[in-house]
Structures are given as C-alpha cells and as structure tokens.
C-alpha cells in the first residue's frame, strides 16, 4: 500500500507583507502541527505494534474552567482507551503551578493558556524551555466582568468605566490569570482601547480563575478577565456584570491548548499522537449536539473538576448570554471545542 502524502507547510515569502497577530498565530500553529504529525509518518492513530503508545498512562493538568472539558471527557467517556492510553486528569490550583509542573515533568500534558506555552518557550514567563502545542482545545468563551458595585454607579461597560474613573479617581484594580496569558491580553487591550493605560492608570493583579468570584465578593478587585464559568458565576451570585466577551474583542480566537514539552514529544511521539487523537475525538463529541453538551456540563460541574453548579456552565456553552443588567442575547460565537 502506498504511503499517504504528507502535508507540507508553506512559509511566507520574505517579500510578503508583514503578518498581523492573528495570521502569525494561525500560521505558527499550522507549521508546528504539520511538522509534528508529518514526522510521525503513519496515517493511522494507533495500531498494536511499533506505533503503539510508548507511555500507557499520562497525567494531564487542568484548571477548573469550562474549557477543560475535552480533557475530562476523553477520560470519563473512555475515549482514551481506544487509542491505547489512559488519561489521568490532574486538577491544578493556578497557571503558575501548571507551568512549573509541565517544565519539571510532574505533568505530561496540560490544558493550558496559549500564551503560557509561548511564554515558557521564549523564556518570558519563567525559565526558558522548548515547548509544543499539540492542538487547540477551544475558541471563544472568555469574558471581562466588572463588579456590581461599579455597575450600580453606571460603569457596567467600558464607556461607563472611563466616565467613573474620571469622576471618582482612585486606584482601580483589575485581575487577570497569568502575565503572558490571553486573559491579560483581553484585559489590557480592552482597557487601552478606551484610553486607559493598564500599567499606569490602573492596578493589574494575577488571580487564579477559581478564585476570581470570591475575590470580587470581598472587594479585592473592580473587574476581572477570566474564562467561563466564572464570569457567569459572578452574575448568578449577583456580584458582577458582563462588560464584554472575548469573542467581542476577537471572534474565534484561539484560547486553551493541549501543551507539553518538546522533550516529551521527542521521547514519546506515539503517546503524544494517541493523546491528541483521543482529546480531539472528545472535542468533536462535545460539539456533536445538545445532549452531549448537557452531559459534559453535568460531568465537569462536579467537585473533582470545576466544582460549581451546572447552570453556571450550561447556558453559555449554548450561547445563551445575559449581562447581569437585564440584557439577554444568543451569541453564535460562543465557546467551540
């Protein structure tokens, strides 16, 4: 049987116009993925033989967020077994902890921020280490939340926030989840678009996603940028309002990825391929229909995973949004897996 033609990646010509940030991310990911999968050579995912996974059991770190779902469901549904591996989801407390455990080998893979992997690879968010992005886990589905106290003063959106900051000058505090992560990017870009310098006109702090709502409740911050379900949780609890969604800022943006180290991929290429295939199948299963999404929400809401109520998860994965101030809408650009 003839071997399938391997995909090739075409790099931009040196004389071509400069890439914008979106094109650069897309092309960089495409080149990395093409190089990896082409190097594996085999079109099948796993067969009992020389391409069997070298490591049968893998630990995958995750943060309690809706977009950890593909990792969790690949394990819960037994999809991983189809590919000859056993996925063990490991609940982590912070993105810094995920970074450290990936780098030192305590975790084999992680549900992780796109920008965290690049930060480690470039040495801008800790010790430099070559990293690998196996696949994008989701697009869209993050948000910018302002406190209900600000909203009650007319600052439930960016325009109102600018007006309030001028009317009542003080140190305004906003939280994001990791310095080189997408949530920092959403927050800084959003503030700067209205003339608010995120480094000079406000105070930015880092708070792990599951702790955002609790910190807003006690008044430690005026707003935050985080993934779901914590934006919706703040609305349900009556302490926050949705000022913007990440898809408002950048439609269909890449968000979390399945990340690992380059060393792991080199040492266990078949395992890397099998794990990626299992999680990709789980992602497709989630997006396969309403019943699947409801089962997913019910599963990840449990204490072992996100530890929140199902209603904090299931509305926004279906695109059913409310802003906490009486506005509701159906968003076709909700989280996609």
Name each model-derived stretch:
Residues 1-23, 38:
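N-terminal secretory signal peptides
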Residues 144-145, 257-260, 264-265:
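Short glycine- and hydrophobic/aromatic-rich loop-to-beta-strand nucleating segment
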Residues 267-337:
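Secondary-structure end/capping motifs
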Residues 65, 93-96, 181-182, 210, ...:
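Soluble non-cytosolic domains of exported or imported proteins
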Residues 252-253, 295:
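Short gly/pro-enriched beta-turn/loop segments at secondary-structure junctions
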Residues 23-45:
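N-terminal export signals
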Residues 29-30, 107, 221, 280-284:
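Solvent-exposed alpha-helix faces
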Residues 47-206, 215-252:
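Short, glycine-/small- and polar/acidic-enriched structural segments
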């Amino acid at each position: 049987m003839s071997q399938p033609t391997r995909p090739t990646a075409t790099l931009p010509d040196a004389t071509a116009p400069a890439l914008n940030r979106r094109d650069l991310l897309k092309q960089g990911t495409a080149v990395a993925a093409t190089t990896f999968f082409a190097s594996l050579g085999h079109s099948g995912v796993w067969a009992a033989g020389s391409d069997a996974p070298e490591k049968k059991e893998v630990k995958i770190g995750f943060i309690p967020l809706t977009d950890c779902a593909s990792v969790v469901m690949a394990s819960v549904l037994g999809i991983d077994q189809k590919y000859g591996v056993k996925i063990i989801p490991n609940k982590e407390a912070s993105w810094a902890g995920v970074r450290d455990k990936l780098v030192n080998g305590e975790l084999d893979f992680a549900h992780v921020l796109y920008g965290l992997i690049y930060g480690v690879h470039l040495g801008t968010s800790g010790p430099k280490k070559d990293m690998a992005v196996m696949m994008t886990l989701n697009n869209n589905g993050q948000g910018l939340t302002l406190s209900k106290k600000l909203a009650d003063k007319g600052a439930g959106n960016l325009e109102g926030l600018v007006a309030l900051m001028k009317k009542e000058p003080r140190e305004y505090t906003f939280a994001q989840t990791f310095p080189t992560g997408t949530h920092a990017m959403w927050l800084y870009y959003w503030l700067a678009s209205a003339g608010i310098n995120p480094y000079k006109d406000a105070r930015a702090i880092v708070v792990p996603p599951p702790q955002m709502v609790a910190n807003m409740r006690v008044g430690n911050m005026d707003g935050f940028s985080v993934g779901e379900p914590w934006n919706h949780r703040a609305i349900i609890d009556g302490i926050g309002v949705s000022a913007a969604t990440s898809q408002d800022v950048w439609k269909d943006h890449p968000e979390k990825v399945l990340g690992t180290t380059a060393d792991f991929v080199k040492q266990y290429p078949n395992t890397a391929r099998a794990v990626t295939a299992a999680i990709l199948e789980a992602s497709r299963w989630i997006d396969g229909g309403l019943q699947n999404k409801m089962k997913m929400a019910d599963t990840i809401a449990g204490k072992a995973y996100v530890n929140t109520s199902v209603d904090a998860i299931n509305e926004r994965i279906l695109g059913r949004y409310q802003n906490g101030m009486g506005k509701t809408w159906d968003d076709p650009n909700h989280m996609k897996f």
